[in-house]
Design a protein with these regions (language model features):
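Conserved beta-strand-loop-alpha-helix junction that forms the acyl-donor binding cleft
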Residues: 113-116, 127-128, 132, 142-153, ...
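A short beta-loop-alpha structural element at the N-terminal edge
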Residues: 11-25, 31-38, 185-212
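Conserved acetyl-CoA binding element of GNAT-fold acetyltransferases
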Residues: 90, 99-113, 271-288
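Conserved acyl-CoA
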Residues: 112-114, 123-142, 293-311
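Conserved glycine-rich acetyl-CoA-binding loop
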Residues: 108, 112-123, 149-154, 159, ...
C-alpha cells in the first residue's frame, strides 16, 4: 500500500530513515504556531526533539516504506528529496454499528510556506484520503480535522470540501462559573442514572446527525440491554482520570437534566509538561435552557481539573456559534477555541 504520488514537483510517500530531524523540525514549527494561536506550548528542551527525531527514524525503519502501520498513517511531502511537509492519520470507528463510517483523524498537518503554493498540503490530504479509503475496504470513511479558530487554514480546508460539524470553546479553570444555589446541582453519574443517560445519549446522537457529523452511531433504540450496559459502566470503579467520567446535572427532584463526559490526561512530549482537560458529549434536556443546567456541570468539571493541576478545559461537541449551547459556554467564561471539519474520504 505504498503511497507514491507526484503533483508538480511534490512527491508524497512514507517517511524514510534519516528524515527524523527534518520531520521533528516540522513538528516544532507546528507546535510554535499553535502556541501563537493560544494552544498548548511545546517544550524548549532540544533533547526532547533529538529523541523525537530518533523515534521517527526508528518508526520509518519499522514501516519499511509503507505509510500504514496498524491504525496509524504517516505521510511526508518531499521536493528534490527534502521533506517539506507531513501529515498523520489515525484510523478507527467511533461507534459500535457496522454502518457507522470509519474515521481518519487528520493530525499534525504542516507544510513549509514555500511548498504550499505548489499544492503540498492538498497532495498530503489527497493521499491520506486514499489510504483511509483503502483501509476501510469498501466501507465509508470520513476524514476529520480539528482546526483552531485563529488558524488561517480554515479557507484551505473549505476549498478541499471539508465542512464544520462541531465546535469547541476553552476556559481557564480557575475562573469557575458561579452557580445559583438550590435550582440545579451537578454530581458524578451513578448507575441509577442509566435510563436518563440513555435518553440523553439518543438526543446527542440525533443532534450530531442533524449537524451532518457522520463519525458516530445513529440514535439507538432504548432497551434494557443498552440501559444495563450504561449502568454497568457507571458502576465500575475508574482506574485513573484519563478514563471518561460521566457528570450529570439534576434538578431539585433529582431528575437528570444534562450530562457530559470529563477526561483529564497528560500531554506527551514535545508538548511542555501539563494536563489537558476535555468536557464533551454535552447532552441536555431540550425542555431546559442550556445556561442554568450547564453552569453547575462546568463548575464541577473545573474543580476536578483544578485538583488535577490542569490550567484550562476544552468544552467540545458544541453546536455552531450563535446557538444557545455554544453561547452558554461563552457566558460562563469560555472563549472560542476550535472546530471539527470533515469530508468523506
Amino acid at each position: 500500500m505504498a503511497a507514491v504520488t507526484v503533483r508538480e514537483r511534490i512527491l508524497v510517500r512514507a517517511p524514510s530513515p534519516g528524515e527524523g530531524i527534518q520531520i521533528a523540525g516540522l513538528w516544532r514549527e507546528l507546535w510554535d504556531a499553535h502556541e501563537r494561536w493560544g494552544g498548548y506550548p511545546g517544550t524548549r528542551d532540544e533533547r526532547v526533539y533529538a529523541r523525537l527525531a530518533n523515534r521517527l527514524d526508528e518508526d520509518a525503519r519499522v514501516r519499511g516504506g509503507q505509510p500504514v502501520l496498524g491504525r496509524h498513517i504517516h505521510l511526508v511531502a518531499a521536493i528534490h528529496g527534502q521533506v517539506c511537509g507531513q501529515v498523520e492519520g489515525w484510523f478507527e470507528r467511533h461507534g459500535a454499528e457496522a454502518r457507522t463510517p470509519y474515521t481518519c483523524e487528520v493530525r499534525s498537518l504542516i507544510v513549509h510556506p514555500r511548498a504550499r503554493v505548489l499544492g503540498a498540503g492538498k497532495a498530503l490530504l489527497t493521499n491520506l484520503a486514499r489510504m483511509s479509503h483503502e483501509l476501510a475496504r469498501g466501507a465509508p470513511s470520513v476524514l476529520a480535522a480539528e482546526v483552531l479558530e485563529p488558524n488561517p487554514a480554515h479557507g484551505f480546508y473549505e476549498r478541499l470540501g471539508y465542512r464544520p460539524v462541531a465546535w469547541s470553546s476553552r476556559m481557564v479553570v480557575s475562573h469557575e462559573p458561579r452557580v445559583r444555589a438550590g435550582e440545579f446541582v451537578a454530581r458524578p453519574a451513578e448507575p441509577q442514572d442509566a435510563l436518563a443517560l440513555a435518553v440523553l445519549e439518543s438526543m446527542l446522537a440525533a443532534r450530531r446527525r442533524a449537524a451532518h457529523d457522520e463519525r458516530f452511531d445513529r440514535p439507538r433504540a432504548i432497551d434494557a440491554t443498552l440501559v444495563g450496559a450504561i449502568a454497568a459502566h457507571l458502576g465500575r470503579r475508574h482506574r485513573d482520570a484519563s478514563e471518561p467520567h460521566e457528570l450529570v446535572t439534576v434538578d431539585a427532584r433529582g431528575d437528570v437534566r444534562a450530562a457530559a463526559s470529563l477526561v483529564i490526561s497528560p500531554l506527551d512530549p514535545p508538548f511542555a509538561r501539563t494536563r489537558r482537560t476535555i468536557l464533551g458529549r454535552f447532552a441536555i434536556d431540550p425542555a431546559r435552557e442550556p445556561l442554568p443546567v450547564l453552569a453547575p456541570l462546568i463548575a464541577l468539571a473545573c474543580r476536578f481539573a483544578i485538583a488535577a493541576e490542569a490550567p484550562t478545559m476544552e468544552l467540545t461537541d458544541l453546536t455552531l456559534p450563535g446557538t444557545p449551547l455554544y453561547d452558554a459556554t461563552l457566558s460562563l467564561g469560555a472563549h472560542p477555541w476550535s472546530r471539527i471539519v470533515t469530508r468523506l474520504a
